[in-house]
């Protein structure tokens, strides 16, 4: 998990490396990112749209944080500095899931919380600072003339349903799917449905 997060935080290097790979191939590809991975997909689409035949936001948003959201993240950073990353993740991880899922599969949520031991305070703080500082990229959605996938969790507290729907009107071609039993972790909460959505989208774009 830490290695994945380090890659996410180093967005510019990741975009550059993906661009290098793209230049070695004559084919375009689809790029789909979950949560902060969606910010990377947007950044890549902004810089290298010619290499994409489509892209997708899975529980992610092109909007920059509003000031009140930034303040919540700053308070999270204070908590991490005081109590530690693992304590913070034990408190916040359950909120990523719909209540029905946490009640039915507490062991899965616990396993994810256990993985949180791999995060250092510094790494998690970097993650939050990156989210605070990310720019608004709604113009990317407006200017991209190929298909854009949106997978939205009806019970998502991190990116509320109404906020997610607002961005769906921006692209020329939007493919919108709402997971009615999911919050922010639809690939776990409604795994089969999420996989089918992804496969159907990719089958039509590759």
PLM regions and their residue ranges:
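Hydrophobic "lid"/C-terminal helical patch
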Residues: 5-8, 21, 92, 128, ...
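Conserved acidic catalytic loop of the alpha/beta-hydrolase fold
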Residues: 1-29
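Conserved alpha/beta-hydrolase catalytic His-Asp/Glu region
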Residues: 65-71, 83-143
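Acidic beta-to-alpha connecting loop that harbors the catalytic carboxylate
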Residues: 154-157, 181-183
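Conserved hydrolase catalytic core segment
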Residues: 26-66
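Short alpha-helix in the alpha/beta-hydrolase fold that links the catalytic acid
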Residues: 146, 160-169
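Short beta-strand/loop motif that positions the catalytic acidic residue
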Residues: 144, 150-152, 156
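Catalytic active-site module of serine/aspartate enzymes centered on a nucleophile-bearing elbow/loop
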Residues: 172-206
């Amino acid at each position: 998990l830490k290695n994945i997060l380090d890659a996410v935080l180093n967005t510019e290097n990741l975009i550059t490396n993906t661009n290098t790979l793209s230049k070695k191939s004559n084919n375009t590809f689809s790029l789909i990112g979950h949560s902060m991975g969606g910010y990377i997909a947007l950044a890549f689409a902004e810089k290298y749209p010619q290499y994409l035949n489509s892209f997708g936001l899975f529980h992610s948003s092109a909007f920059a944080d509003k000031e009140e959201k930034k303040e919540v993240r700053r308070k999270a950073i204070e908590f991490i500095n005081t109590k530690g990353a693992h304590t913070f993740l034990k408190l916040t991880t359950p909120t990523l899931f719909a209540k029905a899922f946490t009640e039915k599969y507490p062991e899965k949520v616990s396993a994810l919380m256990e993985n949180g031991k791999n995060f250092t305070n510094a790494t998690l703080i970097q993650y939050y600072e990156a989210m605070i500082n990310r720019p608004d990229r709604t113009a990317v959605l407006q200017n991209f003339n190929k298909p854009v996938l949106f997978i939205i969790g009806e019970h998502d507290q991190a990116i509320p349903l109404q906020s997610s729907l607002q961005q769906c009107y921006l692209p020329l071609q939007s493919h919108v799917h709402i997971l009615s039993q999911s919050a922010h972790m639809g690939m776990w909460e409604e795994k089969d449905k999420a996989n089918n959505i992804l496969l159907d989208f990719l089958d039509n774009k590759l």
